[in-house]
């Protein structure tokens, strides 16, 4: 099960955070700081899976952005690693080569995409067309 999903830039600034288990606000800040430090300090040659406290971190870097997913011990690391790539491909489809600015200025749409893909910490959809369908309908409604 996915515990949290983070998008972070190289400077360590959180661009998106989504928690699927309750974590108090003051503990979230500490958790994010430690997780970000753990991922940013690693070299490209090191594995993208990290054992951290009572869960695993799986991360991928795309240009200046890192996507970090915290999961429980029973989750398949490779499945989450590919899920991260699928998420970025969906963002690329919607934004036509997504950038950090797209995420910052369209955070609501990024949350909709993530909510279409993950429900209560479980991956429920990976088909790009089905994931983007609600957003395309919203875009049509706002255009008219």
UniProtKB/Swiss-Prot annotation:
Q: Does the keyword Membrane apply?
A: yes
| GO terms (BP aspect) | protein transport; vesicle-mediated transport
Task: Tell me where in or outside the cell this protein is found.
Answer: Golgi apparatus, trans-Golgi network membrane
Major site of localization recorded for this protein = Golgi
Answer yes or no on keyword ATP-binding. Answer: no
**Xref: InterPro entries:** AP_complex_ssu, AP_mu_sigma_su, Longin-like_dom_sf
Q: How does the UniProt record describe the way this protein sits in the membrane?
A: Peripheral membrane protein
Task: Provide GO CC annotations from the record.
Answer: AP-4 adaptor complex; Golgi apparatus; intracellular membrane-bounded organelle
Which one Pfam family would you cite for this protein? Clat_adaptor_s
Q: Which Gene3D superfamilies match?
A: 3.30.450.60
Q: Keywords on this record?
A: Golgi apparatus, Membrane, Protein transport, Transport
List, alphabetically, the CDD domains matched: AP4_sigma
> Which branch of life, at top level?
Eukaryota
Q: What does this gene product do?
A: Component of the adaptor protein complex 4 (AP-4). Adaptor protein complexes are vesicle coat components involved both in vesicle formation and cargo selection. They control the vesicular transport of proteins in different trafficking pathways. AP-4 forms a non clathrin-associated coat on vesicles departing the trans-Golgi network (TGN) and may be involved in the targeting of proteins from the trans-Golgi network (TGN) to the endosomal-lysosomal system.
Subunit details: Adaptor protein complex 4 (AP-4) is a heterotetramer composed of two large adaptins (epsilon-type subunit AP4E1 and beta-type subunit AP4B1), a medium adaptin (mu-type subunit AP4M1) and a small adaptin (sigma-type AP4S1).
What the record says about family reads:
Belongs to the adaptor complexes small subunit family.
Provide the protein name.
Answer: AP-4 complex subunit sigma-1
Q: Which organism is it from?
A: Bos taurus
